[in-house]
């Protein structure tokens, strides 16, 4: 096989969404698996809707996911002369023609078709204009579109690696436009010219583009160019099998990033939207998918987006991430919540991250779980107050805990646990009667990391202060 060359061609008219990210990833994995090239092309011929901000977001999203490109970004808006050159070639060879029909004429054709129960199609009115007629229209200042002469009989077959052969009757196509009256190419025409000039061997894209493919094949054939191989991946649907949209929660890469998902978890999850490794494992790193990825293993069936599964995968990565890397990516979330400023103790944060990460699913969760290390506990979980602070002996137990902790030296998780175990025996109570109200007193919460980990990280002074504050709270509550 000649060198594999694939492309991802986003339009900079919005965010990089999960479907687009998956298309980019599948192209990238296919290129890396085959030792080929991944090209980034920007379909920005819609100048009114394309924005620099969108393009910047798409590039940042790809980089964040670890999807690097070998060539590009190549902007269609900078290649307009190339499209005009190929359109002129088709005009010269009689495979395309100028069409001067007005909006009113086209509307009349649509109405007539509707009246006759036919699908609305261009009638080919300008297909056989004479050279003199064309020159006269141009002299009058009329601005034509250019239409492709589509064969009116036969079939166009899409040989799709994922879906098999898909046939289209040529009679269902009219002579579609390849160049607009403002001299801009249509999507299908620009795509064909680009794919040819960039040497694209495989076009891997979403199923929604399948209807464009026969038109692109007709353009390839008219230009006498080699047709690339096609692979159309299934749609990503919402859990109710409707089209995925904002009402189903986060759908853009930036939103996932802001909500504290790790790029490795996103890549792992979106790889599973249509592909699975040979061993059926659901947690795998990108080196494994690069090694195993083939289009033959991509499913034809729609992929169902499941945010709970994504969050579960993200939790796995948080628990197993390199601790320094995890600390670095948590820090911006701590800053955003004003838990820390620019001057912070990295080693202290790292220690806290190491104890809180076991239970958390996102970086936002990790940051929230760290709150009581940086801010005072101003309120206690209501269910904890009812369950632990209303017990008759709790004040006496906590007072004895303060006396005990004041004597502990050095103050760490081992010495505090030893002291607490002895106190439990001395008071002849269950460990829960001491441990649970202490946890609530020093963290404001009923669940979290190990109690003695929390004590060590808070330090002796803050631990005792918080227990004393809780005693005061309980006594006031009882008055």
Swiss-Prot record:
Gene3D superfamilies on file: 1.10.10.350, Glutamate-tRNA synthetase, class I, anticodon-binding domain 1, HUPs
Keywords: Aminoacyl-tRNA synthetase, ATP-binding, Cytoplasm, Ligase, Nucleotide-binding, Protein biosynthesis
Biological process according to GO: glutamyl-tRNA aminoacylation
Compartments where found: Cytoplasm
Segments carrying motif 'KMSKS' region: 243-247
Major subcellular site: cytoplasm
InterPro entries: aa-tRNA-synth_I_cd-bd, aa-tRNA-synth_I_codon-bd_sub2, aa-tRNA-synth_I_CS, aa_tRNA-synth_I_cd-bd_sf, Glu-tRNA-ligase_bac/mito, Glu-tRNA-synth_I_codon-bd_sub1, Glu/Gln-tRNA-synth, Glu/Gln-tRNA-synth_Ib_cat-dom
Reaction catalysed by this enzyme: tRNA(Glu) + L-glutamate + ATP = L-glutamyl-tRNA(Glu) + AMP + diphosphate
Amino acids binding ATP: 246
Gene Ontology CC terms: cytosol
Motif ('HIGH' region): 10-20
EC code: 6.1.1.17
EC main group: ligase
SUPFAM superfamilies: An anticodon-binding domain of class I aminoacyl-tRNA synthetases, Nucleotidylyl transferase
One Pfam assignment: tRNA-synt_1c
Oligomer and partners: Monomer.
NCBIfam families on file: gltX_bact (TIGR00464), PRK05710.1-4 (NF004315)
Function description: Catalyzes the attachment of glutamate to tRNA(Glu) in a two-step reaction: glutamate is first activated by ATP to form Glu-AMP and then transferred to the acceptor end of tRNA(Glu).
Family: Belongs to the class-I aminoacyl-tRNA synthetase family. Glutamate--tRNA ligase type 1 subfamily.
Name of the protein in question: Glutamate--tRNA ligase 2
Originating organism: Thermoanaerobacter pseudethanolicus (strain ATCC 33223 / 39E) (Clostridium thermohydrosulfuricum)
Lineage: Bacteria, Bacillati, Bacillota, Clostridia, Thermoanaerobacterales
Gene name of this polypeptide: gltX2
